[in-house]
Amino acid sequence: MANPSQFGFQDASSPIMEELVEFHDHALMVALAICSLVLYLLALMLVEKLSSNTVDAQEVELIWTILPAIVLILLALPSLQILYMMDEIDEPDLTLKAIGHQWYWSYEYTDFKDLTFDSYMIPTSELPPGHFRLLEVDHRVVVPMESPIRVIITAGDVLHSWAVPTLGVKTDAIPGRLNQTSFITTRPGIFYGQCSEICGANHSYMPIVVESTPLTYFESWSSLLSTDS
C-alpha cells in the first residue's frame, strides 16, 4: 500500500517485484558511479591543464570504449533475466481471466464452474470507515498465497491496463486480444491497483483489489461464492 509523500516502491509482495526493486537499486548505483566519474573529470579539467598527450592518448580512447560496454553488460544481463522471469508461465495452480470494461472489471475463475463476478468501485458515500477512497471494490480478487497464478487479460470495449504495483504486474487489456501475465504472492494481504491506461471519463474509478489468503481460506471462499452464484 502506498503512503503519503512516498518516493520509493511499495513493499514487494511477489518474487518478480523483489527482483525489480533489486534491479532498480543496481541500476541506480551504476548511474551514481557514472555521474561521480563525470563530475570528477569535469572538476579535474577545471583545476588542471590538459596536455595534448592526454587528449590524443590511445589508452583513453580504449577506456571510454570498453568501460561503457561493461556498464551496458552489467545493466543488460539482470534486465534480460527479469524479462524472462516475467514471461515465464509454467504450470499455474490457478487461472484467472480479467476483462476490462468502462468502468469496471469482470473476473472469471476458469478452473471453477460458474465462478464469475463483476468488480465495481465502492462510491465514497457508501465507503465503510477505515477503508480507502477510490481504491475499494465490492468484490475482491481472492487468490491462494504462494501459488503460481496466471492472469489472462482482455477488454470488452476500449484499451485498459491491469496493474497491481506491489505484485510487479502491469499488462494491457486490448479488445479482441488475450494478453497474459503471472505472479506469486509471498504473503497474505490486500494489494491495491488501478487501471493504468486512460480509458475514458471514469478512468480513475476502476480500481483493482487482490486479496492473498492461505489455501484453506481460498477454498472456503470459492465454495461459498460458487454456491451463491
Swiss-Prot record:
Binding site for Cu cation A1: H160, C195, C199, M206
Catalytic activity: 4 Fe(II)-[cytochrome c] + O2 + 8 H(+)(in) = 4 Fe(III)-[cytochrome c] + 2 H2O + 4 H(+)(out)
GO annotation, cellular component aspect: mitochondrial inner membrane; respiratory chain complex IV
Domain of life: Eukaryota
Function (record text): Component of the cytochrome c oxidase, the last enzyme in the mitochondrial electron transport chain which drives oxidative phosphorylation. The respiratory chain contains 3 multisubunit complexes succinate dehydrogenase (complex II, CII), ubiquinol-cytochrome c oxidoreductase (cytochrome b-c1 complex, complex III, CIII) and cytochrome c oxidase (complex IV, CIV), that cooperate to transfer electrons derived from NADH and succinate to molecular oxygen, creating an electrochemical gradient over the inner membrane that drives transmembrane transport and the ATP synthase.
Cofactor note: Binds a dinuclear copper A center per subunit.
Organism: Struthio camelus (Common ostrich)
Name of protein: Cytochrome c oxidase subunit 2
Family: Belongs to the cytochrome c oxidase subunit 2 family.
Gene coding for it: MT-CO2
Cofactors (names): Cu cation
Main location: mitochondrion
Annotated disulfide bonds: none
Presence of the UniProt keyword Metal-binding in the record: yes
Membrane topology: Multi-pass membrane protein
Record note on quaternary structure: Component of the cytochrome c oxidase (complex IV, CIV), a multisubunit enzyme composed of 14 subunits. The complex is composed of a catalytic core of 3 subunits MT-CO1, MT-CO2 and MT-CO3, encoded in the mitochondrial DNA, and 11 supernumerary subunits COX4I, COX5A, COX5B, COX6A, COX6B, COX6C, COX7A, COX7B, COX7C, COX8 and NDUFA4, which are encoded in the nuclear genome.
Stored InterPro entries: CcO_II (IPR045187), CcO_II-like_C (IPR002429), CcO_II_C (IPR034210), Copper_CuA (IPR001505), Cupredoxin (IPR008972), Cyt_c_oxidase_su2 (IPR014222), Cyt_c_oxidase_su2_TM_dom (IPR011759), Cyt_c_oxidase_su2_TM_sf (IPR036257)
Mitochondrial matrix side: 46-58
TM helices/strands, residue ranges: 15-45, 59-86
EC number of the protein: 7.1.1.9
Binding site for Cu cation A2: C195, E197, C199, H203
Mitochondrial intermembrane side: 1-14, 87-229
Annotated GO biological process: ATP synthesis coupled electron transport
Compartment(s) where it occurs, according to its Swiss-Prot or TrEMBL record: Mitochondrion inner membrane
Annotated GO MF terms: copper ion binding; cytochrome-c oxidase activity
